[in-house]
């Protein structure tokens, strides 16, 4: 939950309603099937599924829903430095697509979900545009600060 909370925070920041729960592809398979197969009916637009180790959850969720699924590989205590999770989510068979973000990158999963939703919701699209503008300004401020401390002799 510590990793996945970053996605929830992004969605809240963008004003997107969300549903946060815990399901397991291995320990609660019927709960996972019920959750994923009813998600569109409940009004969800995108599912973000985080998993560690064998990381079957995102793929299994994608197999029973028509919604876009974003997989977040999570480095767990028994993982192979997270590579098992990354590869499990990346290597999906044709017909069961899962968008995959970097290891523990739930924030990017939230941003990707917001961009998907923003393609059909002008309010969310505006918030995403502002988010990107804010990031641009932050980088420009850092560059200006560095340049003032370390002037570049090759600038024109």
State where each predicted segment sits.
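Alpha-helix C-terminal capping segments
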Residues: 10-14, 59-68, 92, 118-119
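Glycine-rich phosphate-binding loop
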Residues: 35-74
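C-terminal binding/interaction regions
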Residues: 1-2, 6-7, 81-156
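Glycine/charged-rich beta-loop-alpha catalytic/anionic-binding loops adjacent to active sites
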Residues: 14-19, 43-44, 67, 90-98
